Amino acid sequence: MKKSPEKITLGLLQHPCGPDPEANFATVLAATRAAAADGAQVICTQELFRTEYFCQSENHDIFGLSEPVPGPTTEVFQALARELGV
C-alpha cells in the first residue's frame, strides 16, 4: 500500500523592496520568524528580496549587487533556519 505524502506547511514571503538592502533584509528576516511562528516548515522568499527589482534590462553597473553562494546572506539564513527548526 502506498504511503500518503506528509503534509508540509509552506511560508511564501512577498514584500515591496525599497532602495536600502539592509532594511529589505530585516523585513525578510522578521517575516521569516513570523512564518515559522505560524507553523511554516519550509519558507520561500521572493527573488531579489534585498534590492529593488532591476531585471527589466541587462545593466552591468549593478552586477555588484550579486553575492556568492554560500555567502553572507545564505549564512544568516542557515543560522536562522537552525534556530527556528525550518
Kindly label every feature range from the protein language model.
Residues 1-7:
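Basic/polar N-terminal segments that are highly enriched at the extreme N-terminus
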Residues 3, 14, 59-60:
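Generic signal for short, ordered secondary-structure residues
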Residues 7-19:
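Active-site-proximal beta-strand elements of phosphoester/diester hydrolases
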Residues 21, 30-86:
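Cys-nucleophile CN-hydrolase/nitrilase-fold catalytic domain and related Cys-dependent amidase chemistry
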Residues 24:
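Substrate/cofactor-recognition hotspot
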